[in-house]
C-alpha cells in the first residue's frame, strides 16, 4: 500500500478528486435547498457528535477533501438524503 499521496496511481487521485467535487456540490445544493448556512449545518453536525472546523466543512463543500465516514453519516441525517444520492448522485433523489 502506498505510504504517500504522490505514490498513488494518477487514476486513483483523479477519481478521488472527482468524487470529492461531486459530493461537495451535492452537499452544497441540498444545504441551500434547506436554507441552511454552512455554520448552521456545521452546528447541527456537532449535535450529531461530529466536530468539524469551519475550514474543514468549507473544504468538503468545495470538493477539496472527501468527508470521512462520521461526516458522511451526519450529513446524510441532517440533509435527509439517502447515501446513494449523497455518494453517487443517483436513485432516491431528495
Q: Predicted segment positions?
A:
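Short, basic amphipathic alpha-helical segments that act as recognition/interaction helices
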Residues: 81, 89-92
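A short, Lys/Arg-rich alpha-helix, primarily the initiator
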Residues: 2-34
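Short alpha-helical DNA-recognition segment
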Residues: 34-59
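Residue-level detection of the helix-turn-helix DNA-binding "recognition helix"
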Residues: 32, 46-47, 62-64, 91
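Helix-turn-helix DNA-binding elements, focusing on the entry/boundary residues of the two helices
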Residues: 27, 38, 54, 69-72
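Short, basic-rich loop-to-helix N-cap that marks the start of a DNA-contacting helix
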Residues: 62-77, 93
Amino acid at each position: 500500500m502506498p505510504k504517500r499521496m504522490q505514490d498513488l496511481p494518477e487514476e486513483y487521485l483523479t477519481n478521488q478528486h472527482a468524487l470529492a467535487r461531486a459530493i461537495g456540490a451535492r452537499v452544497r445544493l441540498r444545504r441551500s435547498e434547506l436554507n441552511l448556512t454552512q455554520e448552521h449545518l456545521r452546528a447541527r453536525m456537532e449535535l450529531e457528535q461530529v466536530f468539524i472546523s469551519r475550514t474543514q466543512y468549507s473544504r468538503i463543500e468545495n470538493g477539496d477533501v472527501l468527508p470521512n465516514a462520521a461526516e458522511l453519516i451526519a450529513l446524510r441525517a441532517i440533509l435527509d438524503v439517502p447515501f446513494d444520492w449523497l455518494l453517487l448522485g443517483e436513485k432516491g433523489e431528495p
